[in-house]
Amino acid sequence: MKDEKIAKKKLTINDIKNKKGAEPIVMITAYDALFAKIFDDYADVILVGDSLNMSFNMKESTLSADMSTMLYHTKAVCTGAKKSFILADMPFGSYTNEKQAIKNAMKFFKQTNADAVKLEVGMHQVNLVKRLCEEGINVMAHIGLKPQFFKFEGGYKIKGKSELEAKRLVEEALAFEQAGAFGILLEGTLSNVASEITRQVRVPVVGIGSGADVDGQVLVWSDMLGFFEDFKPKFVKRYLDGAALVRKGVQSYASEVKNKIFPSEEFSYKG
C-alpha cells in the first residue's frame, strides 16, 4: 500500500476552503500529542473532538466534557501536530448564548494553537455562528446527527429520512454558510441528502456516516484503528486491529517479566 503522507506546510483556513470540489479532505480525531504527531503526516484536519469523553475517557456520552477538558487536550494536540489544521470542539453547555460562546471560543485561540472551533448547531443558532465569525473566530457548523442532543432526541438517530427533514438540513447548511461558517460537518445523514447539501453549499462538507458524495471524511481514531472490539458502527471501517496488537505486546511483556526473560543483558547497564 502506498504511503499517503501529505507533504505540506502548516495548513490554513484558505487551504481547507480551497479543497471544496478539488481534493477530498482527510480529517481524523486526536486527543494527545503522541497520536497527533503521527496523524500530522496524513491528516488535513485534526479534530479534537468531545468524542474523547467516550473514546478516550470511556464515559457513556460526550455531555460531561467541559471547557477545561477540551482546552487541555487541544493544547496537547497542538504540541504534537505542526502542519495539520486543528479544529477544536466546543463542549455541551459552552455556547448557550452569544456572550458565553464568544468568551469560550476565544479561549481556544488565546490558550491553544487551534485554528477553528466546531459547534453542534441548529437554525436557532445561525446568529450565534455569525457573531463568532464577526469576532474573527473560524467556525465549522456540525449538523445532522448531533451527539450532544442524544438525550433530547432519545438516542442517536439517522437524519434525512423524511422529505421535510432533508429540506431542513439543506436550509441549515445554506444558512450557516451565509453566516460565515467555513465548513459543514455532516453526521449520520442519508447519503442522497448529504450529496444534495454538498452540491448546494460553496463551503466544504465533511461527512461522518453520511456517504461518499461529500468533500471529505472524518472518523474517530480509536474506532478506525480497532481499539473498540465490542463497538462498531455501520459507517466505521477498521483499518487496523489495534486492540489485538496492543494486547499481544503487553501479554509478551508480562510473560517475559514473570519468567525473568526481560530484562536480558542486552537491556541492562553493566558496571
UniProtKB/Swiss-Prot annotation:
Keyword tRNA-binding belongs to the record: no
Catalytic activity of the protein: 3-methyl-2-oxobutanoate + (6R)-5,10-methylene-5,6,7,8-tetrahydrofolate + H2O = 2-dehydropantoate + (6S)-5,6,7,8-tetrahydrofolate
GO cellular component, one term: cytoplasm
Catalytic machinery residues: 187
Highest taxon in the source lineage: Bacteria
GO MF annotation: an example: magnesium ion binding
Protein name: 3-methyl-2-oxobutanoate hydroxymethyltransferase
Localization annotation: Cytoplasm
Keyword Protein transport set for record: no
Cross-referenced InterPro entries: Pantoate_hydroxy_MeTrfase, Pyrv/PenolPyrv_kinase-like_dom, Pyrv_kinase-like_dom_sf
Record EC number: 2.1.2.11
PANTHER family: 3-METHYL-2-OXOBUTANOATE HYDROXYMETHYLTRANSFERASE
UniProt: 3-methyl-2-oxobutanoate binding residues: 50-51, 89, 118
Keywords, in A-Z order: Cytoplasm, Magnesium, Metal-binding, Pantothenate biosynthesis, Transferase
